[in-house]
Amino acid sequence: MTKILTIASVVTSLLWNTAASAEEPAKKAPVPTPAAAVDEPLTEIDLKLREALVKGASMEEIAQLKEPVAKTPQEAIRALKSGNSRFFGGQARRPEMSANERRAQILQQTPFAVVLGCSDSRVPIELVYDQGLGDIFAVRVAGQIVDPGTAGSFEYAVRHLKTKVLVIMGHEGCGAVKAAMLPAAQQKAEPEHVRYLLDQITPAVTNIANIRDPKAKMREAVIANVRKQVALAKENPVVKAAVAKNELAVVGAFYEISSGQVDFLETEEELRLN
């Protein structure tokens, strides 16, 4: 009986020591800090907003704290070019906003650019230019046409939001431009509103040079449509007035989906209609 108790005591002791040794590393191991508990460094705008909130600033005053990305048309174009360089170079920052920065935009938006682009799902305007919330006033429609609807949007951006550049951006492989190059009989088979879109594009692409390479010909057609839409936008009274005061620049752009790069059409020569 005594031998049995002794064996039992030894086994119990071994089990106790094993359990204790198993727990020991866990006690010594450092406990990782949860990611949510790590304080992120405050940005300059965060500090300004915190100070304003402590002082009891109104929402209107808080909205004014966001610094503009660009104050001139030239700065706006440079900001778009720099953002696109980051995008196609694989260095996109995809700017994120802190909660305070989002709150600062509740009552007011301050975009520095208005971009009229195609509704193609492969052409996300803010991503292409690596810009964040509130930086670009985006207007999208198939074939990036200038008509009363889109004009109303960019008029608002120019007159009330004081955007510094209006970009008309076409893109590689645009389906609307491709359809506008089809024979009239095929275009007539489309629904009414699709035909309306094609009617706004067809005049720009009917006299495209006889280029053998399909890709090169398509590029020329898209750029021809961009030139036409830029010309129409420049005739808009609100746009014309802002350009005359050097408050706005109107440029064209061609986005190459395959590379991610945007080529800008800025000079009179580049924007001249054929």
Regions found by a protein language model. Name each.
Residues 122-139, 145:
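Catalytic core of membrane glycerolipid acyltransferases/transacylases, capturing the structured
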Residues 1-4:
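Positively charged n-region of N-terminal signal peptides that target proteins for export
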Residues 23-108, 134, 144-152, 156-161, ...:
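Divalent-metal-activated hydrolytic enzyme cores
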Residues 168:
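Conserved functional hotspot residues or short segments at active or partner-binding sites
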